[in-house]
């Protein structure tokens, strides 16, 4: 098992959890782009940033206790990381390999499916669940209403898991 995370705290946490569980894994600090250099993999599980982000100056100040901004901020449509990840996913996988990708319904699920399929991957939504807005989306709810991503008063989002298989 090889794990990549851009956040140093997450890397330390993963190493600690592996030690407690008595398993040996290779944990590296880096983005999915760094993972391309170690590819191909049989299974890739990805939870990239996917939260739509207001333009500079329109974003309310979020508590530092929520974690680093890069853990969720993903550009105005939520696809800043999703789009290049989906376009490169086939390069992360060996033949017969699978990608499991989690994202918000606010960040263009069909776009992800189309992008994955355009690289000859077989892609489908395999799980979805509606959940209440967490603190980040709650802070951005007014902006999300203004740009039409959520209807007025809506305070829940759909999270989906996409599976993409490489033949």
Model-based region annotation:
Residues 119-122, 138-167:
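Core SAM-dependent methyltransferase catalytic element
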Residues 22-32:
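Conserved SAM-binding strand-loop segment of SAM-dependent methyltransferases
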Residues 39, 48-81:
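Mobile active-site "lid"/loop adjacent to the S-adenosyl-L-methionine
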Residues 33-44:
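A short acidic, Gly/Pro-enriched loop at the edge of an enzyme's catalytic core
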Residues 7-9:
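Conserved SAM/SAH-binding beta-strand->alpha-helix loop
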Residues 1-5:
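Conserved SAM-binding motif I beta-strand of class I
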């Amino acid at each position: 098992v090889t794990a990549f995370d851009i956040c140093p705290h997450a890397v330390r946490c993963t190493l600690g959890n592996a030690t407690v569980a008595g398993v040996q894994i290779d944990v590296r600090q880096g983005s999915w782009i760094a993972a391309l250099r170690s590819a191909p993999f049989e299974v890739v599980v990805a939870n990239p940033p996917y939260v739509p982000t207001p333009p500079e100056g329109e974003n309310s100040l979020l508590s530092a206790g929520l974690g680093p901004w890069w853990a969720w901020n993903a550009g105005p449509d939520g696809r800043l990381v999703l789009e290049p990840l989906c376009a490169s996913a086939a390069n992360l996988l060996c033949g017969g390999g699978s990608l499991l990708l989690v994202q918000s319904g606010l960040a263009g699920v069909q776009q992800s499916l189309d992008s994955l399929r355009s690289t000859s991957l077989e892609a489908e939504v395999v799980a979805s669940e509606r959940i209440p807005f967490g603190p980040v989306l709650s802070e951005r709810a007014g902006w999300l209403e203004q740009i039409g991503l959520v209807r007025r008063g809506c305070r829940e989002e759909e999270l989906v898991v996409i599976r993409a298989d490489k033949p």
